[in-house]
């Protein structure tokens, strides 16, 4: 009996993990906040150093985190922002994606999905740690939890700790409108 319960618990945990990586999250509400945005740099898909402070100076900045490049949920999240990129750009919004993936994986993901924004390769988790993004599967794999931040004037003004996938851009547009 105890063995069956252990098996059931293990299966439920595996299902939850797989859903968080591959599944579709519902639209996140997020919360308005106000604290200094992390000043850090990372390496993009092309190997160039991206200084986040320089990006923040260009205008409102969306920094979104995702577990794994090329997986269904992460693709929906990134493509939501890709499809709204022209509208976001008109508002002066910069977009940066971050995951633990290696540079070559980020480069492939960007090319495959025709993403018009940088993807930060963060295999050591320095950017993830700077933003205090939770890690999934600690000790087993390095996967960032799906989260999104909106930065204005060097301050994080909105944080969605359970960021949506297909509705990511709609959430950001809504928050931008509320902040005007």
Language model: regions and residue ranges:
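Thiol-/selenol-based redox modules, centered on thioredoxin-like
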Residues: 143-180
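Structural microenvironment flanking redox-active thiols in thiol-disulfide oxidoreductases
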Residues: 75-115
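Short active-site neighborhood of thiol/selenol oxidoreductases, capturing the structured segment around
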Residues: 52-75, 81
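Bacterial N-terminal signal peptides that target proteins for export
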Residues: 1-11
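Short, internal strand/loop/helix patches
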Residues: 96, 113-145
